[in-house]
Amino acid sequence: MQLSPSEISGLIKQRIEKFDNSVELKSEGTIVSVADGIVTIYGLNDVAAGEMIKLPGDVYGLALNLNTDSVGAVVLGDYEHIKEGDKAYCTGRILEVPVGEALLGRVVDALGNPIDGKGEVATDLTSPIEKIAPGVIWRKSVDQALQTGIKSIDSMVPIGRGQRELIIGDRQIGKTAIAVDTIINQKGTGVKCIYVAIGQKASTIANIVRQLEEHGAMEHAIIVAATASDSAALQYIAPYAGCSMGEYFRDRGQDALIVYDDLTKQAWAYRQISLLLRRPPGREAYPGDVFYLHSRLLERAARVNEEYVEKFTNGEVKGKTGSLTALPIIETQAGDISAFVPTNVISITDGQIFLETDLFNSGLRPAINPGNSVSRVGGAAQTKIIKKLGGGIRLALAQYRELEAFSQFASDLDEATRAQLNRGQRVTELLKQKQFSTLSVALMALSLYAADNGYLDNLEVSEVIPFESALHALAETKYSDVIAEINETGKYDADIADKLKIIVEDCKANQAW
């Protein structure tokens, strides 16, 4: 086939028009060492701190050390195929994770990849794992209660929406049980929950997922899992990933709760990474910025005002405040709360729930020590009826603890002291609560009213829990309208007090326990 000169010139013109003369600029470096999940890269002069670096085999690294002529990065995934001499490239992006409603009911890893076998997460939205916390001007004071359903917490150490409340104690003492009960109690309240498991066994996480599913709580929960078999890098970034997922709800005028279980293991992972990166060790071999590790995470839990939500959503959501409540967990060694990481997190948070081994072993569960436990901002958020009735509980316990030690040395006690000891014993018994048996505001108020007004004083200590069960059963069947009214309003006045009195006296008269 012969082409005429005009056709040839036409083809040449077409080729010239289609010719792509764009230049692709890539910042390239060479891997000079790889060991223990840390790669050292020569070159990459344009890399930024916290930037993702593309490594061979569709694996990414996180730039943490920026030296004069090299970059120290931690590998996010498998690094066995990476070898000396391989090329690495800048991406110009910082690490992002998927966010959105589609994550509810799912179990994901620290990078947001699903690990529950239910297929891909149907969301296109992503968010950086590192964000600056809202400034003072965008915040609103904490004045809405976050009910845990646990008597000893809601009455003595109340938690508000947007608060950071530390749960601290030794291992195997019920820290996770409190967090799981709190997540279960948010069912039907509209509060979205994120549970971040750091450095736990996969079987333990599977058990928590099963418990949440059994109690219908997975519908409003996201599980972010960085198991003990995952790399230190994934255990380090998991809390930040979970926080970004919670901020999605906070910034859109909704309420969210995030549990970090536990931040001690995150600090261990960060210490491991820092030592491998040859950063100078400080106290307990932790790096100098271990305080900042936790402070920048926990400061992101906040209650934001209407203006912040309206600005963030470009006016789509108006007149709504958002909140992210954080329940960080810290594991102590033999009750030592003066160690480095516990003291750091105590100083960052708005209060702590201190669990004690001796109380746990004596059968008091949840094993909360009311003397060391405090809520710095939750009092303003406490439900009115619980605040009114819970004050007497704390006082009775404080007097009981003081007199209990004294009474061991005194043989003859006056009537008033004996009455205080009796009241304290019964209040202590009343605060015992089994796991997965959270209470509504009304039923909790009923129990507190009975204790406050001396209705438990003439019962045997062993009869307190059966009496409470009978009281709740009677209230839910015969006085359901009163229970519904208290749950709806949360107020306390003479009328409500009279109604509570009628219920308690009815139960006492029947002696149905």
Curated annotation (Swiss-Prot):
Any one GO MF annotation of this record: proton-transporting ATP synthase activity, rotational mechanism
GO CC term, one of those recorded: plasma membrane
Residues involved in ATP binding: G169, D170, R171, Q172, I173, G174, K175, T176
Site feature: Required for activity: S373
Gene3D superfamilies hit by this protein: 2.40.30.20, ATP synthase alpha/beta chain, C-terminal domain, P-loop containing nucleotide triphosphate hydrolases
Signal peptide positions on this chain: none
Family classification: Belongs to the ATPase alpha/beta chains family.
Protein name: ATP synthase subunit alpha
Phylogenetic lineage: Bacteria, Pseudomonadati, Pseudomonadota, Gammaproteobacteria, Thiotrichales
